[in-house]
């Protein structure tokens, strides 16, 4: 417990809150270029091959982003849009790629939850 004099000399320091998406730098989305597109395996109770991409953003930060939906057309040098949102069973993946924008195609034959996957309304 500090004395009054100690508090006058040096005030209490605020504990900085950790940001969940630091690479976005307070922007809702960011543009970037894929440097590597690959699959990775999730944490212990789950088993799959999750599609992820290493993306170099316009602010020169390189992040790992998840590619949602079934099937994708991304490859190296594809220009993508990134939003926040982590993938719980992939450590270090704190961003999602936005489907249906820039070089990323929407999910084919998607009927429900279409807006999240950039799919047009079926005829």
Swiss-Prot record:
Keywords from the UniProt entry: Methylation, Ribonucleoprotein, Ribosomal protein, RNA-binding, rRNA-binding, tRNA-binding
Modified residues (3-methylthioaspartic acid): 89
Disordered, as annotated region: 104-123
PROSITE patterns: RIBOSOMAL_S12
Database matches in Gene3D superfamilies: Nucleic acid-binding proteins
UniProt cross-references to InterPro entries, sorted A to Z: NA-bd_OB-fold (IPR012340), Ribosomal_uS12 (IPR006032), Ribosomal_uS12_bac (IPR005679)
Pfam family, one: Ribosom_S12_S23
One GO cellular component term noted in the UniProt record for this chain: small ribosomal subunit
Signal peptide: none
Biased composition (Basic residues): 113-123
Biological function: With S4 and S5 plays an important role in translational accuracy. Interacts with and stabilizes bases of the 16S rRNA that are involved in tRNA selection in the A site and with the mRNA backbone. Located at the interface of the 30S and 50S subunits, it traverses the body of the 30S subunit contacting proteins on the other side and probably holding the rRNA structure together. The combined cluster of proteins S8, S12 and S17 appears to hold together the shoulder and platform of the 30S subunit.
Subunit text: Part of the 30S ribosomal subunit. Contacts proteins S8 and S17. May interact with IF1 in the 30S initiation complex.
Recorded family membership: Belongs to the universal ribosomal protein uS12 family.
Protein name: Small ribosomal subunit protein uS12
Organism: Oleidesulfovibrio alaskensis (strain ATCC BAA-1058 / DSM 17464 / G20)
Gene behind the chain: rpsL
